Amino acid sequence: MESPLIYVMLVLLNVFVFSSGVIHNKGKERTYFSCSGEGILTGLHTIKLFLTMDNLKVRCFFRNENQSPSKEILGLFTSGGLAPNMIITNSTFYGGYYFKLTPFSNRLEWLIDIPRQNITVNTDIAAVEQWMIKITMHEGLNIYDTEGTLLDLVREPILQWNLGRVLTEMEVRDLYPEVNDIKVTKSPCANDVALIGFMMKPSSNGVFIGKTISGFWTYKECIWHDLTEIIYAELKDEHQGLTVIDLVLTNHFLVILTSLGLYVSSDLRYPTTSQIKLSRAEFCGFERVDYIRGNLWYNEKCFANRESFEVDYVTITFNRNRTLSESSSCFFSKEPFLHWLPCVFSTIKNEKSIPRVITFLIDQETDSGIYLFNVQDTKETYVTVAMLKDGKPSPRPKFPSFHFPSTFTLPLGMIFHPRSHFLYVYGSQIWVSMDGGNTFEMLCNLFSHHVTKTSNSFYTSDIVFIVEDGRILTTKAGLTTYSELGILKDAIFTLYYDQLGYIHKLTPENFDAGSKLLGHGNSGSIFGKRPDLGFEAILVPQYISTNEMYFFAHVPLTMPTNIQWKKRFKTIHLGKTIEFSKTGLANIKNVYMHKTEPVGFQTSIHTEIIVPFGIENSKDSPCLLSDLEITYSGKLYYTIKLLSKNPLHELKSTDVEKSVLIPGYSSFLIMNITDKWTASALATMPQAIKSNLKFLTGSWFLYNFGTAGGRKWSISTRQCNYWIQQDSLDFMSLNLVKYIDVGNTIDFQFKIIPKAMSTFPIPPVSMVVGNPGLVEVKTQGVFDLNENYYLDIHVSGRFFQKGSTSIALVLWEGSSKCYAITLLPTIKSSCSYLRTMHHTPGRHIPPEDWISGVHKDSQGFNMIKTLPINYRPPSHMGISIPLTDNFYHADPSKPIPRNQFHKSKETGKYKQCANVTSRAMCNCSEHQKFSHAVAFSDCKEKVHRFKFPVTQYPVVLEIFNERDKISAEPPYLVTMTEVNMRKNWQLKHNEPENVKKMKHYLEPLLKTPVYNPLGLNLTIQGSELFHFKVSVVPGVSFCELSEEFQIYVDEVPLPFPGHALIAVATSVVLGVLIFIAFVFQLRNIHPLKALKKSIRGNPGLTSSTTVSS
């Protein structure tokens, strides 16, 4: 036997591994934080914060479900040095911020104050993701956290417009009796921003739309607008009977279908007026009666950080067949929705044979169009997928159409689950496709009922189907099972999911989000207690093993055929839990239908036993103390005889409807008692009985799953049965977006932890790739000794092709009560907005020294140069003749130096400081002042300073991603230019054979030298400012990677051209001197001797005379 120490070590190892990363489906604590920002306190178990141009100020209380906030609670934590922190995330961003340790306002609150620029520096109007926030605090082994949202009010497009006259509370109340239905649409990137429209009765008139910024948490928060006059401004004749029919809010446009036409807003990102503008789209031949029966269809996608291939499409369908004079009864358009094209062209002359387009959706992942067709005369329903060519569907299908069975009699619509590739077709049945419409699997058959509306949550992957009888069916994206949330009796209502996945019931006069909100989407007060999915029928257990059991549902042989369905197991029971009142719990693995045998049992379920079911004892059924004999009576029934004649062991009337279970043999349902020792029964496995059977007491058992005295068993949604552990930084979001560049790869790691029975050796997770032609996905999974499942996913790009695809990870055995069953990362084969290239200077200068402008080396040389005001670098014509357009350290109020020559006056243009009169009006931010980009040269004040000459300066380039960085090296070859057209510099680099081949190929195409960034060195022979731009060659990255840096060369001996002139003059003088010396030597002239004599002075002359006689 192995040492117990090994098992202890394994358990501890599992605990330590489990404690790292992010774990979903853990459940919620009964303690939470209540937070508010700028005086807005929701008072709910979720937090709604709003970001304006000011700082984000958040105050938080610590609450307990049965305890109000108090000084004592806060004091307990702060005395231990504890304070919460706030995590802000979305699909591409993760940031952590910390509250002050000392609570605010007399130790009653924690306070945090975050400048806007610490969260985002952008202020332009655009589709931007709403942030998820989590307030969390650790205390010992306890973790307290509360989730919420943060909405940017500055950037959300629809919030920048006035939708029309604001209605008073009394005016809104007057509309309630006239409302016929309600329609809801939400912002694709910020689901808390939503619009609700009233569909009025024919006797009323007007377009009334409500707007919320907090996800309809309270009715008072919703602002109602009257758009009637805005619509009337576009109408020429008919004004009566105007009402909302449908509405869609895309990333950048609002589309409203009314009874008098279709109206499209201008681009919401560019408000030219305060009031929204709507234009009418014309459809020839369609009138008010057609618009009333029309529908809008939209595949919801969030286009935050929008790519060039991302565009919204909207479809309008009219619930009628087209006439021979009309091109189509279905039209679609892409933004800006100016031109509407027919979804399909048909040349069929027989009107009844023309397939009617019920729905047409654009699948943006595979760039295809998906049709849901219905043929009137044949009652045929099918789905066809066509590729898009030049923005139009091709008449040739992508693959053969999928035809639904004839039992699908009422198809009504088709939708994509948002941000995924799961396609749902609904009506009298619900079908789901995992492969974009190629194949479908039936999820639910509603028989005589049908689905009227749907609602979904991208965050929790929930999707609900509203049935016309008020039932609410729900499932998770990718699951092939469903359950029932409950029944709503409201005459007019719809359901809506907010950003965090909480479900809301909306009626004309009230919004209900539920009162118990501990968990994602847990709104028990809306539906009440989840319904018992059981039915009034006798169940017979059939033993398979200690872990498995079948249950057969008995249908009386005399029961009318038309109501026999009431006593059958159905597809809704798949994946649920069957529970016995005495004791016993099992998960339903499969549902089976039986056509002939066994007689009396039309359906059965296969279960996995979690808790053994309780058996009858001898006190309740004394017959258990007797031996048993079973024989076939020849009339469908089997005869059960008690071999003991002891009066204390006889059968009782209460034994009717009980089941006889014998391990290894068929089970029997006692139908009636003939006498004290004999009963007739039905067998669950009659084909397995070959002869008479005898069993000793203790070898057979009785179960009571009958209905006499009330049903003792129930079926319900099983509890959450899996934990999902992810890397804490890579996968903070359930719907993260990852970018993959050319030649790059992405790796994900997950750990699936079963809370009950494991699926070993079958992997518990399935994976669906939306566009498998875009990326290559490899997986590797393994079970550990504790039957936890580890999954590694490796994603790499296939071609130099831009696009996006979802990768769905579905826990197919998971319960819908887990909020995280489906993980939906999106892979974009494109350039990440976080992917940049940076030059790493050879020396580090602290930020505080940059601010002061002084950083000296060991020799006292200041390594920072503060540029003169309105500075421009020299040109090849001289220091005083700058020819560049770029100003540095610009100040329009100051004179421009070096501006005497005509060519210098013609050049030089302000950018940031254009059309202003002072530097303060340039609005240069600190980021712009320190930026190396030529676009911000007006703001640039300080640069790196070097002594002349600069030789072999290493140009070190690094490419940064979200979390890591790599050195720029082949194949990332680069080009380098000086933005001010200066010449006195040169580069040296390494040229291995592969680099030479790429240079020979690229340089003729680019018409510029190409360099290897690895080992690149720069030499500068000129003076003053050099501004370089390094760019990665095209074709090796989706990103246009470039970097700029400046070098100021100072302490040059003499500026050009003085140095050369002195050299020439010196040479001439030396030459003249040599020539003069040569002439003196030739004439025997000795200038030095003459010079010496002149220094001594001239002596007196003497005379000598001789006279002879």
Swiss-Prot record:
The chain crosses the membrane at residues 1056-1078. It is found in: Cell projection, Cilium, Flagellum membrane. Its main location: membrane. One of its GO terms (biological process) is sperm capacitation. It comes from the Eukaryota. GO terms for cellular component: CatSper complex; cilium; monoatomic ion channel complex; sperm principal piece. Residues 1-1055 are extracellular. Disulfide bonds join C35-C60, C189-C302, C330-C343, C720-C818, C831-C1039, C913-C922, C924-C939. It is a single-pass membrane protein. Signal peptide: none annotated. Residues 1079-1109 are cytoplasmic. Keywords: Cell membrane, Cell projection, Cilium, Developmental protein, Differentiation, Disulfide bond, Flagellum, Glycoprotein, Membrane, Spermatogenesis, Transmembrane, Transmembrane helix. Pfam families: CATSPERB_1st, CATSPERB_2nd, CATSPERB_C, CATSPERB_head, CATSPERB_Ig-like. Glycans are attached at N66, N90, N118, N321, N672, N915, N923, N1017. Component of the CatSper complex or CatSpermasome composed of the core pore-forming members CATSPER1, CATSPER2, CATSPER3 and CATSPER4 as well as auxiliary members CATSPERB, CATSPERG2, CATSPERD, CATSPERE, CATSPERZ, C2CD6/CATSPERT, SLCO6C1, TMEM249, TMEM262 and EFCAB9. HSPA1 may be an additional auxiliary complex member. The core complex members CATSPER1, CATSPER2, CATSPER3 and CATSPER4 form a heterotetrameric channel. Auxiliary component of the CatSper complex, a complex involved in sperm cell hyperactivation. Sperm cell hyperactivation is needed for sperm motility which is essential late in the preparation of sperm for fertilization. CatSperb is absent in sperm from mice lacking CatSper1, suggesting that stable expression of CatSperb protein requires CatSper1. This is Cation channel sperm-associated auxiliary subunit beta.
